[in-house]
Amino acid sequence: MEINYQFKNGNEYAKVPGTSYRDNGKVRKKGVIYLGRVIDKEHHIFCNRERGIFSYDPDTGVFGKADETYISDLKSDGRKKQKILLDFGDSFFLDALIKSIGYDTVLNTLPYRNKDTLRAMVQYYLLCNSANDHAKIWYEGNFASILYPKANLTSQRITDFLESLGRPESTSAYFDAHVSWVRSICDDPAVLMDSTGLPNSIHFPLTAVSNHNGKISREVRMTTLVQRDTGYPLLFRITPGNIVDLSTVTRTLNELFLRDMSADFVIMDAGYYTNDNIEELYACEVDFITRLSSKYTIYNQIVKEHEPTLRRKENLVQYKDRYVYIKRVECKIGHKEHTAYAYLGYDVDRGSDESHKALKRAAQNQTSTADLHKTLENSGLFMIVSSLPFEEDGILPAYYTRQLIEQYFDISKGSSKLTPLRVHSEEALYGHLILSMIAATINVHIQNRTNCIYSNKEEIFMTLRNQKCTVYKSKITNAEPQKKANEFYEVFGIKCPLYIEQSNGQLIPVYHLEKPV
């Protein structure tokens, strides 16, 4: 099929001319295809508003995706003026921070060739909670457009980018590099494991109806490992929403072992406790702490035997602002009856609150006397099981380090664009989650470093965003950073330049005044 080319306002455009026919004496055209602007004539790469950058085979008439390695520039058509005043501080700070902590080496391992698109999208996930459709608007008004000039943030190209990022070979390469980076900072073998639901109404195999703790939803389930000492995520696994937590323990830990990172201690929620999982952990010499559900026989046996002597003075311990009675009991767990330690506890505040609510329901005739008695008996009781013999006043601090993973989920969902899901394929889902994990890792690092100064991450980026820059032909000057912005720069050891030289596509920071020659 022939392609016609023509120049207009200095730009080359292409179309398939179609064929002519007569209609009531008039010559008309049919089969005309406007391909848009020519990006690469030799390889038949074009660009238009409908498809973004794409390929077209003139022999078969088939449209395709432009190769992901394609980074040819799309020159401005002159109708849109380039912005000369841009948001500067936030993107300059993030670019310098990622390089200073060595995380750019992790990003470089991802096989997506247009690294400008990758880095720009990482910044977008860190700085904006809007849909990806708005990424180009943000990019055009931010210094990121100078840092990453070859980034292509059109809507269709972002979809292609996410699908490429989510391919198995890409996710595996990322996890390998990321785990290696975390290990270079801290080799703590203690990990936290938990899962969270990602609600999703789009139909693909990973979406399923979930009943998690009594909450019914259509979702994808994400199981995550977090390093205890640093709070950094290590990796995640995705399962359909109807896969229960207890079946994911061994496979999730195995993903970590495959990357030569050991784990000799794992803290889990109650949903992961089964005899099979306990046997696997003992076989691999992995110690553990987990909460034990009241549905297990061993729970009820220990309560029956030891609850009458639990609330005694010698068993009362303080944990932060809570007072809890705790009694350690040696027990046998698993198919092989391994020696472990159960910590039977009674939370005074929680027991009082649950009893008050039960009495209120009973007063409204919403519960029977038998049910009320059972509720009052069990109010405030809980049990933690561990393979290690912690002291009674040490088990709660050890167990509640798992709040780190809950904080990580809060960071991921609140500051790293984890939810809502706006993807239509499994590959795009994985690509989105990889970007969210990258953003969450940087957010965790920022939180760890600034916890003593500012707890609100948004305050950091909004303060930095107030620092603008002016783009000239060969220089980029930036305004004076505010006092708080200077504090952030100082905490992270980042020096803000006086101006930035643009020379042969390179950005050269200049920190001192130079007299013109």
Report the location of each language-model feature.
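Dynamic "connector" segments at or just before major functional cores
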Residues: M1-L192, T196-S201, T224-R237, N242, ...
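Short, flexible loop/turn motifs enriched in small residues
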Residues: N9-E12, G214-R221, D229, E377-S379, ...
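Secondary-structure transition/capping motifs at alpha-helix termini
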Residues: D23, N142-K150, P168, S184-I185, ...
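Short, basic/hydrophobic alpha-helical segments
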Residues: S180, L246-A263, N275
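An anionic, glycine-rich sequence signature occurring as long contiguous blocks
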Residues: R218, L235-I238, C284-A398, N466-V517
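Acidic, metal-coordinating catalytic cores used for nucleic-acid/nucleotide bond scission
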Residues: I267-D276, S294-T297, E427-L429
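Short amphipathic alpha-helical "interface-anchor" segments enriched in bulky aromatics
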Residues: G394-R422
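Basic, amphipathic alpha-helical segments enriched in Lys/Arg and hydrophobic/aromatic residues
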Residues: S425-I446
